[in-house]
């Protein structure tokens, strides 16, 4: 069905007749994960240290001890459309730890995704993560708790975008009848893990998320001024 949303969301005509693909161009996701892995890297050359981020996330607490991160490091197109805005930490204190920094950054991305999905006229029925960032299962856990929904992660999630694009060719060439055939094959043959939300943590995140939504309106004017 046609998507009517705010932000930079739009519709693409799919290869399959009378089917629309709802596209929401989140600009900040895996790049933010890579950025914090670079900033906190133990490597003198600053090579992104994803292993260290995983270790920090194991130590972290939901809510990052009051630290918030607005993840728009390259501007954003969805859930807000603003090319001037940039990433921001709010709530830094003398007690802030590296684990808080790592946790808050990935929480910020999760909050942004939740805010974007809430712009749709219907709630998401199923959330499947793709891309390299899905390899960080602690981040998947954060997203599941922020969304309050089960998250599905298939084997080799970084390859799924290429397979999905290939499925369009399969439909066009008649190799498969429709996209549902591709999805059914993936569900039956592709190894899939699920991440379940923790009800107590999800309830806590709901309140934190309400505060997060107030950050962008506060900083928008600051970033809109040119110097």
Task: Report residues per predicted region.
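Active-site core segments that coordinate phosphate-bearing ligands/cofactors
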Residues: 1-130, 135-227
């Amino acid at each position: 069905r046609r998507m009517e949303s705010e932000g930079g969301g739009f519709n693409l005509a799919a290869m399959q007749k009378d089917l629309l693909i709802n596209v929401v161009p989140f600009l900040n996701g895996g790049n933010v994960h890579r950025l914090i892995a670079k900033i906190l890297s133990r490597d003198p050359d600053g090579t992104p240290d994803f292993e260290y981020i995983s270790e920090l996330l194991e130590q972290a607490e939901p809510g990052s001890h009051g630290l918030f991160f607005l993840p728009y490091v390259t501007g954003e197109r969805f859930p807000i459309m603003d090319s001037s805005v940039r990433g921001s930490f709010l709530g830094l204190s003398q007690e802030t730890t590296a684990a808080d920094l790592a946790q808050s950054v990935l929480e910020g991305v999760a909050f942004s995704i939740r805010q974007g999905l809430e712009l749709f006229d219907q709630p998401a029925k199923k959330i499947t993560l793709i891309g390299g960032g899905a390899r960080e299962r602690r981040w998947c856990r954060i997203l599941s708790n922020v969304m309050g929904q089960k998250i599905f992660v298939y084997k080799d999630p970084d390859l799924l975008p290429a397979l999905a694009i290939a499925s369009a060719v399969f439909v066009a060439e008649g190799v498969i009848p429709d996209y549902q055939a591709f999805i059914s094959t993936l569900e039956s043959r592709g190894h899939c893990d699920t991440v379940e939300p923790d009800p107590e943590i999800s309830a806590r995140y709901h309140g934190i998320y309400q505060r997060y939504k107030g950050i962008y309106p506060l900083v928008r004017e600051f970033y809109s001024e040119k110097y």
